Amino acid sequence: MRPFIVEFLGTPEAGKTTSVKMLRRSLEEKGYKVGLVRESAEIVPDMFKTGSSKGNIWMTLKTAQKLYEEINNDRDIVLVDRGIVDSLAWNYLYAKRGEFSEEKSKCAENFFEAIGVKTDFIVALTIPTEESIRRRGGEGHVVNRKFIEEFNREIIGNFLKSVEIDKVLLNTESKTPVEVHDWLLGAIEESYAKFKENSASKEEE
């Protein structure tokens, strides 16, 4: 049975990376074999502008490589800090801006399908624009008010609704990291149990 892939995405500063680290530790303590795919946005080469469609293509390829390694490893669960769905979400946004075609976006989606990489469960963490800016300590050059508002409106508000994958959406504004962790741990274990049951049924057919 291939591993259960859980992808984290969401508003900047909503707690994605912190949640991934905490959940990985807890799941391993419970006996799960856990893989991790770190966010590739932090290592984009200088030749690709951060926040550009070309930069997103590079991140897509890097994420695909790491995911392909993990699904062929001995894992029960793979936690992904921004992966397939996040990449497709940005393609959707760049297409709306006229920077990327829907045809190219579909090619990217087909590529993931061709190599057998599929997100099984989405964890979308969100916070309001003002809270994101507060947690960052101010607006950045790329991650500014306009960027965050567009992300929450287009990706959290519109794109995710069209994605036919089991998901949870959690506003972390008034929650501590521990509260977020505890809630997500239960949601992930519940979804993983269903995944195992469905996989076992398919193998018996």
Where are these regions (language model features)?
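Conserved lysine of the Walker
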Residues: 16
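Walker A (P-loop) phosphate-binding loop of P-loop NTPases
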Residues: 13
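NTP-dependent small-molecule kinase module
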Residues: 137-205
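A glycine- and Lys/Arg-enriched "phosphate-lid" helix/loop adjacent to the NTP-binding pocket
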Residues: 90-157
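Hydrophobic positions on the alpha1 helix immediately C-terminal to the Walker A/P-loop
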Residues: 19, 23
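Conserved substrate/cofactor phosphate-moiety recognition/catalytic segment
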Residues: 24-69
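Hydrophobic anchor at the beta1->P-loop junction of P-loop NTPases
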Residues: 8
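Glycine-rich phosphate-binding loop used to anchor ATP phosphates in small-molecule kinases
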Residues: 56-116
